[in-house]
Amino acid sequence: MSNTTVEQFAAELKRPVEDLLKQLKEAGVSKNSGSDSLTLDDKQLLNAYLTKKNGSNGGTISIRRTKTEVSTVDGVKVETRKRGRTVNIPSAEELAAQVKAAQTQAAPVRPEQTAEDAAKARAEAAARAEARAKAEAEAAKLKAAKAGNKAKPAAQKPTEAKAETAPVAAETKPAEESKAEKAQADKMPSKKPAEPKEKAAKPKHERNGKGKDAKKPAKPAAPAVPQPVVSAEEQAQRDEEARRAAALRAHQEALLKEKQERQARREAMKQQAEQQAKAAQEAKTGRQRPAKPAEKPQAAAPALENKPVNPAKAKKENRRNRDDEGQGRNAKGKGGKGGRDRNNARNGDDERVRGGKKGKKLKLEPNQHAFQAPTEPVVHEVLVPETITVADLAHKMAVKGVEVVKALMKMGMMVTINQSIDQDTALIVVEELGHIGKPAAADDPEAFLDEGAEAVEAEALPRPPVVTVMGHVDHGKTSLLDYIRRTKVVQGEAGGITQHIGAYHVETPRGVITFLDTPGHEAFTAMRARGAKATDIVILVVAADDGVMPQTIEAIAHAKAAGVPMVVAVNKIDKEAANPERIRQELTAHEVVPDEWGGDVQFIDVSAKKGLNIDALLEAVLLEAEVLELTAPVDAPAKGIIVEARLDKGRGAVATLLVQSGTLKKGDMLLAGTAFGKIRAMVDENGKSITEASPSIPVEILGLSDVPNAGEDAMVLADEKKAREIALFRQGKYRDVRLAKQQAAKLENMFNNMGENQAQSLSVIIKADVQGSYEALAGSLKKLSTDEVKVNVLHSGVGGITESDVNLAIASGAFIIGFNVRADASSRKLAENENVEIRYYNIIYDAIDDVKAAMSGMLSPEEKEQVTGTVEIRQVISVSKVGNIAGCMVTDGVVKRDSHVRLIRNNVVIHTGELASLKRYKDDVKEVRMGFECGLMLKGYNEIMEGDQLECFDIVEVARTL
């Protein structure tokens, strides 16, 4: 409620300003003139003062009252019920005492009061006294609460009398007067427009419990009747409710006015469109129809704008207007199509009246617009996958793609509408545009795999253990397996080192054991990690004469990370330098404690060359397998892991698969990473064709669509369509991730190279026989990169060298490395014609050494200083227009004319520069050797003194190596 001035408040109370100022001063409110501002607190102080002066609170009875308003707007009755409120009513005995006091007591008459006001006050006092007398007479017969209900209406303010809904039991005169006042008050809202100031101030004073006496306090002709008043807390609560009600009414009136204006504009546009359509129709038919029904809401709108209608009235009024609109449309016989029809169907209404060409109608609900404009922004919940294109993101948010591009440009990203962005960026864009973003793997067909895995249940049976042999290079891993398999695999490996994962199964008297042989060279870290992932037990081979080496420590870390138990085979114990105890001590330092020392790791001393203790090693492995109780379902679709994969020129993609559960059969549909296909052939490690493979058996399979990545999980699916769908989804997912990484790498490289000299790059194309080999070679070559020379592996793949590889090398200036592969005739011819270098290797060391040498040749040479001699200055000669000339003696080495020199004084370098001239007996010479005198001048420097020394040196370039 806003502040008012004293003059305005006096006008509302119909009192002179001087009287009001006097009463305010008596109440403790200091106001000097009628223009002073009067706050709510000031009014409450005045109210408390008048209450204290005119009467005191008595015993009260609390009853619940409900206010109901019934008004008529254009012939429609609207009833509004307001929230119930507790009112305190004095008891019958106290009311009787107050009436007696009113009859015997009269207040002094103030001279400044007019005669008309005095007459009014006397009439009102007499009416109140008569009402209280009747209440006193009936107090003995009726209950206290009913007596209070009858006596209160005459004493309450007019607005409270208007709001009463409970009828009075007895037909007394005060009750008739209250009914008359109520009927008169019901007519007032339709006669008077909304007056904010009056409405804001009036409820406050009427609720103070003084009625008309609140407007004319302490009239001289009126008797000073004690009035029942409310407490200060209740008064503050009522004032707060009045403020809230006034604010709510003002807000509702503003909303209603805005809605009516909007409706009027809409009706005007609709009427204009209908008139245009009617004119076009009349031009065809020659008939004219009036458009009066559409004008009715527009004419009624201005009259409604100034009425303070409550929400219930507004709702019924709008419903009636919409009914009129619907009748107007139906009267014209048109308008059953278009947006209104769609809108109606959207809201679930299907009340269409269909007839002939002119009889099509659409029945709209009374509270339904033909057109619904959005009133507030719609917030969508957007599920964002790992990668998403800008167009798809815009579609999910129901916005134009340009808006998303703008938001990304504000974030500093220049993108196109078809470009993919990562999940984090997309979530930021979604929040920036006012929607709710949630990360999700949308439309992921891989969920089918989890559902299928849960559905298949089979009996788990014991299976053979999978044992991986790990250790440092040249410690005898493959030789140990050779003795176990009674073969000569080592002789087939180039350089005598293992460069592939070999998978074999061996039948022993106590059962079958599957062995995986991993490389020991440092370049094959990924292979060793894959071997540990697929294994049950690790045999750690350590040479007794060599000790624990870096790859031994790495193998221990892989085994611990995979949670796999270890059996240590101390090899080469037949050598003279063998020291098995030292091996145990070194391994104990890496938390591999022998069981005889209180640990949990079995140590077996073996000799792969002579076959010592091999049976004991197998016994230890089978003992570990019994402890693990290894089982797997047999009668179920097969699952496994791709150990190695390669591209064979005649057979296509060939993958080595280790079956982990189920039975793999020829003709099964296999899914491995992004590759899928029906198994056309299965071959064991000896090259024999087989038709099925049980758990823990390694096989080579043919028939996949592409070379799968080593380490991928493989599984058999019953549906080829589902396998193709999942493989294609993975291909797209990997491609999006790869493109995003490439773009990030390009930006990172661009910023790293900004402001620096571009480093030289050595481009390489690698082709290998198996994936693990090119993986290891590419990783080793990238580690050779320095700040000055970087190795850029443009392409690496499995298979022979093709013409496309040569063409890529031509375009990029790269050379090709063939690891255990060769180029065909056409590729060799093209490479010779275009001077593309192809190098073939079968040992990884040789390839790394050659690339390192090539990188060393690309390094810029290093400059070094080489001291050639020293000179002592013994005399300084000053020559005008020439400068200072030093007479010197060469004390060591030789002084050359083009040498660089340093001037040293007291063992401190003063100047570094070059010689301007070198003479001996007035002759220019190229050099002066030790023991001879000479004269010389320094270029651009004359601050020389006797006793200084000159150090002569040359700058030479020295080739660098990595």
From Swiss-Prot:
Residues 462-631 form the tr-type G domain. InterPro entries: DNA-bd_dom_put_sf, EF-G-like_DII, IF2_II, IF2_N, P-loop_NTPase, Small_GTP-bd, T_Tr_GTP-bd_dom, TF_IF2_bacterial-like. Residues 607-609 are annotated as: G5. Keywords: Cytoplasm, GTP-binding, Initiation factor, Nucleotide-binding, Protein biosynthesis. Residues 117-141, 173-216, 235-269, 338-354 have a biased composition (Basic and acidic residues). The keyword Nucleotide-binding applies. GTP binds at residues 471-478, 517-521, 571-574. Residues 517-520 are annotated as: G3. Pfam families: EF-G_D2, GTP_EFTU, IF-2, IF2_N. CDD domains: IF2_eIF5B (cd01887), IF2_mtIF2_II (cd03702), mtIF2_IVc (cd03692). Residues 496-500 are annotated as: G2. GO terms for molecular function: GTP binding; GTPase activity; translation initiation factor activity. It is found in: Cytoplasm. Gene3D superfamilies: P-loop containing nucleotide triphosphate hydrolases (3.40.50.300), Putative DNA-binding domain, N-terminal subdomain of bacterial translation initiation factor IF2 (3.30.56.50), Translation factors (2.40.30.10), Translation initiation factor IF- 2, domain 3 (3.40.50.10050). The keyword Glycoprotein does not apply. One of its GO terms (cellular component) is cytosol. It comes from the Bacteria. PANTHER family: TR-TYPE G DOMAIN-CONTAINING PROTEIN, TRANSLATION INITIATION FACTOR IF-2-RELATED. One of the essential components for the initiation of protein synthesis. Protects formylmethionyl-tRNA from spontaneous hydrolysis and promotes its binding to the 30S ribosomal subunits. Also involved in the hydrolysis of GTP during the formation of the 70S ribosomal complex. Belongs to the TRAFAC class translation factor GTPase superfamily. Classic translation factor GTPase family. IF-2 subfamily. This is Translation initiation factor IF-2. The gene is infB.
